[in-house]
């Protein structure tokens, strides 16, 4: 990469309106790191980690550059998806519940992303993300498995891909 391309994420463009750049959608040109993280959220939609309309709905209620509105609006759409996931699971609509849990997990991740390390909302937001991820994994056929391991006195959660993709599916 040339020197100009090295820091595209941090570049504030002359065009102050939301627009497309060669590296993707630039929602808030004056706030490139928020625009970058929003672009990541849009990217998750192709794998079911959100919907374009929900991402745009959340963004439409955010104040450019305001990380409080960022957290609030992602929490709002995440909570709505988590509730719908619970309701759909109780009604026996497993696939819809799974979709809602997966979207909620990603939206909670978005909500947590710009919180300061000592923000008291960080752990509860992360815990909601983890709970939705676990519900999604539990509803897979066969169910996904969460493995917990200790490493340097910190606990990390790992997803066992062997449980998500049985060996007969990918080993020749």
Give the location of each predicted region.
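Amphipathic alpha-helical repeat scaffolds of TPR domains
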Residues: 36, 72-83, 102-111
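N-terminal cap/lid segment of alpha/beta-hydrolase-fold proteins
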Residues: 74, 78-81, 123-167
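Long, non-catalytic architectural segments outside compact domain cores
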Residues: 1-70
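An N-terminal hydrophobic leader/cap segment in hydrolases
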Residues: 40-57, 108-147
């Amino acid at each position: 990469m040339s020197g100009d391309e090295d820091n595209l994420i941090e570049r504030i463009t002359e065009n102050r309106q939301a627009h497309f750049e060669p590296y993707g959608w630039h929602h808030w040109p004056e706030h490139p790191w928020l625009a970058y993280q929003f672009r990541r959220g849009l990217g998750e939609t192709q794998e079911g980690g959100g919907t374009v309309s929900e991402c745009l709905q959340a963004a439409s209620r955010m104040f450019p550059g305001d990380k409080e509105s960022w957290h609030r609006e992602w929490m709002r759409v995440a909570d709505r998806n988590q509730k719908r996931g619970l309701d759909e699971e109780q009604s026996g609509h497993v696939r819809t519940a799974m979709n809602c849990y997966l979207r909620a997990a990603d939206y909670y991740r978005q909500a947590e992303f710009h919180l300061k390390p000592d923000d008291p909302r960080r752990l509860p937001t992360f815990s909601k993300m983890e709970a939705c991820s676990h519900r999604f994994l539990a509803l897979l056929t066969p169910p996904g498995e969460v493995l917990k391991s200790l490493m340097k006195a910190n606990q990390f959660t790992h997803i066992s891909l062997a449980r998500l993709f049985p060996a007969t599916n990918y080993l020749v």
